[in-house]
């Protein structure tokens, strides 16, 4: 089985969000299992390890009525071949996204992915495209390449990581930049504009999301950002596969950033020392109170409005809070002020430091994640890996990965409704369980033994790839 994984970012080369972690981890797990999986992505100006890349060739790529240069480079990391598409006009910039011509940049990239196959000794069975930045790949394949022998058996899978970002532009981009004539523009047009994601949903052989629950949620108007009717029509080719985490990178037994390394056999000593170090760093009291933490962007979608409503009540109940993140000023200001109102009980760091986030995962007693919507979420899995039971709202991948321990065997505390009252109740249940040492230690042990590795997810993807490759 040959897989070409097309993504706009991938670790360790370029990252702005969770897509990079998936693109860096899933192909590695597939290769480990004997699949010939390769990654193709843009060669950004601030790409890491640029000096390690090997030049392959260059060629022209159609962009509407004109052609643009494309240079091809490659590298191999962890047994995975990475291809990098170079065009300084489009990609030699500071940052990955947020430019006025993003539509043109990624229309070029999508077309270049297919053109590249003429110049490498690799014809994939499946091209797995990811989010709107690669959404035109299946559109272009069906319109301009399907009749060629090299392409007529290639199948496409489109993975939706976050349906909120669809790649919407004025319809004038379709002919001038994408080169799609009026006869075919209906494939990409939606609600009066060009919608790249809509084009992929129409033309890809299969559609996946990053969790089974999210695959069901996006059929509902509340979650779909306008695409629910189309997705219900295409539901026969939609499924959800839960993402995994890198179990090697997130390992409390070897993590160099935490105060004391531990595993499932000595977590009591290890977490106690990590908690003490965390309390020292944030100036918190060491009076036996549980420490509940959040590591997140400070935006409403992550449930910060709920946390804002219950924070004072949780502190008054004897819970210490640690918050790491940045985002909307109303939340940054609130949690900064919260420290002043509750000295020794609340610690806030505005910004993001990867090493500090690992210290929090290891040192906190519980991890709060009350998202309004969460396609998959990785933080709750990392928290389990470090023996820090999550408190989550039942949505998307949170619902698929965390199950309430008060209902029997589970690895955290959950609530269903998007309300401050339900979040407060879940936190109180976690606090009550914390003071029952034997029950709490059993929960930590259960969490640390959960298998959220990419090996599990890769098996599901392999099944999907085999099913898709056998479609007529």
Predicted regions and their residues:
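Catalytic cores of nucleotide-sugar-dependent glycosyltransferases that transfer UDP/GDP/TDP-activated
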Residues: 1-472
